[in-house]
């Protein structure tokens, strides 16, 4: 009788008539309390209904009656696993497998429990055993692929995921996971293919859209990434991860203000999400709102005091721009103390965690405080080399010098900015004009987007590599090329290059003045500078050995001016305005020098100062405008009558603005470099005064090389007087213009610095082996 009732209950169970099934299971148990199958099936029903705790008790009763039933132990394991009691689940699966070792599905379940318990190695063994016993287990193959990817065993991951797609070709998940493997390999084109395949199979797969967006971000195709994230949100607005990714994509476009609501939305669905909290801090940091950024870094650190990106930014973040000199001092002291704190933290930190911190920040803005940064740069450099050497010990020891006699020297150049960028314009002449009879030139471009400048530079060298996927990929190529000398055109502007510079990849390593400050790195041997730019005590400002190339130190090509330049009216400038072009990034303007502009305006009628808006944010532009308003107010002048801000311009429009201007005002303590050279090409009179450090003496050096010293002020008073005279004395202004035009040949296309560089490099190598 009980057997018939049990069969009837099971039929109800299978057909989804669960209430009827439950009644009959209870009836069977009442009639025969030793009916283990009834206890087991009743437990399975409770499990299906989501009452896992009841299921556990019922199945345990079944096992007490029939302890050798393997399926009972598996069912108990499933109930424990669904209830979150992972170790008990593992124990139950192991009991099952002790009774039935070839039970492939249970090995899969054991893998699921290990995986949920963060035991990656245990899960891998379980899944591998499962697929050996039964090769068509999709779950085991798919999850193996996920775990192999996490272990960076990418070929294994690809193999098992391909098997999974063959077993279940219409299941989108394995295709999506294949895309993630290729993302991990930084093969973004292939990743995009597989994510798209997943979406074809399941157009509502929000995770696949999110992952596709991440792959597009890997290729720097941010607009396509944003489209994917919007689609993800449309399908599933409660998917938390997309808000972090969307915000990061907007930040990559410089749209920090737009990113903030998406980060905050991510926090609404996951309030303790430390990565999103830190990302919010970064967004406020890049908006120039330092104090707001600090609040979010503090919030992140209350969740995890050792979260490296938040910790490093909390202690070492610097504002983009300052409201006054007191702020400069306050933030500098904060950075100095923070550097000591981080140095102590690194002593006990996990190597990879420390690397995350190092990768999250640079000292870029430190140099815009107008101080001697040698000691602070050296402290940060010591941190960098320590962290990099622990993470990459194989790339941190000194390279032995090979015999260079009777062969060409192998010289490498690396930068993220071998594209239409100041760095490329300043240093392409070295790459082009190093004598190919004596040098094989290797170029390593680590930026994501190439352009006509990239193509041009590639044509100048014997070996060109465009590698933006990872530090490891760049380093491995450099090591394969077995260079004699590696030259960094800039350090301090790109996280990738900054970390590479902290490694020892060639016997001799040099730094150029693309970012004109000492690296502070023991891995950099020489700083390649300019004899005209350095002050007499210049060597004291560097941890590297200072090398003075003649003139301005570079071979700079004559800029090509637009055939049909825009006129003043197109920049909202009047014909009778006296236009002073001051076109630097706003972080170059120190607040103690704001008075210079109203001091000139007070004496030059219809003076108009033209600035370029911040690339970072409107907030930074508004902060600078507020400073200028205060400075002009102190002179009883209205800032808006004299100051014009233009948006970022195309290269040709920027040159048109130079051609439409009357006078170029150099920034104080951080001089124009490429901008000054382009102003010279447009025959603009350059007003400058030499700063304390090389970075404040670029324009001074350029004018000295052209033997035009009458617009160089010995001090700020002279600077203002020269600017005023140029504004009021049109005849003198034209004389200076004519002189500049006549002397272009003294500054442009000068090959002597590159010839000197070649001789220096050969001398260094020959002395090393003699």
Q: Could you say what each language-model-derived stretch is?
A:
Residues 337, 357-387, 505-565:
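Active-site-proximal region of nucleotide-activated glycan assembly enzymes
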Residues 2, 14-23, 48-61, 71, ...:
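Structural signature of tandem alpha-helical TPR/SEL1-like repeats
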Residues 392-524, 529-539, 609-753:
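Conserved nucleotide-cofactor-binding alpha/beta core module
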Residues 6-10, 14, 37-48, 71-82, ...:
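Conserved alpha-helical positions within TPR/SEL1-like repeat arrays
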Residues 264, 277, 286-464:
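N-terminal subdomain of nucleotide-sugar transferases
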Residues 394-410, 562-580, 602:
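Nucleotide-sugar donor-binding and catalytic loop/hinge architecture
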Residues 408-416, 574-590, 594:
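Conserved donor-binding/catalytic core segment of Leloir-type glycosyltransferases
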């Amino acid at each position: 009788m009980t057997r018939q009732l049990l069969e009837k209950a099971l039929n109800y169970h299978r057909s989804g008539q669960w209430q009827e099934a439950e009644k009959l299971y209870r009836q069977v148990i009442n009639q025969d309390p030793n009916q283990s199958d009834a206890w087991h099936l009743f437990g399975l029903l409770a499990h299906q209904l989501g009452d896992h705790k009841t299921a556990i008790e019922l199945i345990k009763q079944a096992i007490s009656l029939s302890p050798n039933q393997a399926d009972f132990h598996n069912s108990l394991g499933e109930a424990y696993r669904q209830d979150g009691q992972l170790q008990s689940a593992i124990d139950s699966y192991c009991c099952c497998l002790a009774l039935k070792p070839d039970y492939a599905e249970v090995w899969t379940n054991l893998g699921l429990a290990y995986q949920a318990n963060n035991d990656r190695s245990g899960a891998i063994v379980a899944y591998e055993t499962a697929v050996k016993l039964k090769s068509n287990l999709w779950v085991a193959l798919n999850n193996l692929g996920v775990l192999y990817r996490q272990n960076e065993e990418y070929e294994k991951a690809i193999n098992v995921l391909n098997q999974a797609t063959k077993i279940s070709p219409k299941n989108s998940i394995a295709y999506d996971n294949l895309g993630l493997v290729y993302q991990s390999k930084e093969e973004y084109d292939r990743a995009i293919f597989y994510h798209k395949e997943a979406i074809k199979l399941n157009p509502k797969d929000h995770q696949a859209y999110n992952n596709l967006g991440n792959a597009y971000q890997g290729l720097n195709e941010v607009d396509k990434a944003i489209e994917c994230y919007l689609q993800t949100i449309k399908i599933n607005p409660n998917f938390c991860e997309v808000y972090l990714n969307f915000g990061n994509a907007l930040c990559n476009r410089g749209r920090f203000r737009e990113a903030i609501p998406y980060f905050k939305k991510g926090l609404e669905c996951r309030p303790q999400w430390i990565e999103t909290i830190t990302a919010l801090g970064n967004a406020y940091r890049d908006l120039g709102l330092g104090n707001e950024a600090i609040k979010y870094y503090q919030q992140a650190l209350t969740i995890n005091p050792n979260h490296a990106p938040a910790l490093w930014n909390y202690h070492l973040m610097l504002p983009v721009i300052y409201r006054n000199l007191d702020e400069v001092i306050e933030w500098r002291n904060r950075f100095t103390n923070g550097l000591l704190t981080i140095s102590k933290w690194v002593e006990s930190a996990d190597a990879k965690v420390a690397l995350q911190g190092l990768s999250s920040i640079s000292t870029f803005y430190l140099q815009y405080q107008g101080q001697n940064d040698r000691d602070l740069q050296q402290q940060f450099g010591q941190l960098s080399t320590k962290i990099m050497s622990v993470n990459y010990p194989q790339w941190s020891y000194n390279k032995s010098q090979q015999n260079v006699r009777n062969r060409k020297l192998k010289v490498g150049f690396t930068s993220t900015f071998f594209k239409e960028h100041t760095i490329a314009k300043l240093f392409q002449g070295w790459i082009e004009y190093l004598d190919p009879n004596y040098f094989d030139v290797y170029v390593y471009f680590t930026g994501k987007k190439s352009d006509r400048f990239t193509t041009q530079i590639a044509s100048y060298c014997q070996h060109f590599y465009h590698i933006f996927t990872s530090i490891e990929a760049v380093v491995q190529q450099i090591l394969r090329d077995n260079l004699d000398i590696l030259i960094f055109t800039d350090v301090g502007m790109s996280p990738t290059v900054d970390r590479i510079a902290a490694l020892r990849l060639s016997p001799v390593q040099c730094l150029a003045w693309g970012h004109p400050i000492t690296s502070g790195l023991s891995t950099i041997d020489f700083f390649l500078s300019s004899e005209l730019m350095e002050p007499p005590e210049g060597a004291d400002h560097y941890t590297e050995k200072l090398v003075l190339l003649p003139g301005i130190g570079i071979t700079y090509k004559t800029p090509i001016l637009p055939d049909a330049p825009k006129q003043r009216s197109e920049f909202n400038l009047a014909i009778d305005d006296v236009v002073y072009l001051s076109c630097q990034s706003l972080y170059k303007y120190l607040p103690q020098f704001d008075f210079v502009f109203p001091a000139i305006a007070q004496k030059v009628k219809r003076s108009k100062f033209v600035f370029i808006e911040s690339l970072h944010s409107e907030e930074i532009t508004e902060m600078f405008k507020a400073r200028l308003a205060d400075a002009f107010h102190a002179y009883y002048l209205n800032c808006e009558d004299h100051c014009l801000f233009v948006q970022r311009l195309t290269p040709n429009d920027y040159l048109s603005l130079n051609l439409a201007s009357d006078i170029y005002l150099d920034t104080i303590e951080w001089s124009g470099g490429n901008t000054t050279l382009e102003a010279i090409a447009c025959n603009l009179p350059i007003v400058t005064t030499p700063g304390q450090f090389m970075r404040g003496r670029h324009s001074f050096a350029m004018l000295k090389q052209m033997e035009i010293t009458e617009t160089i002020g010995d001090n700020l008073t002279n600077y203002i007087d020269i600017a005023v005279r140029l504004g009021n004395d049109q005849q003198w202004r034209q004389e200076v213009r004519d002189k500049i035009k006549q002397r272009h040949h003294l500054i442009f296309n000068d090959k002597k610095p590159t010839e000197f560089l070649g001789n220096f490099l050969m001398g260094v190598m020959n002395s090393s082996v003699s």
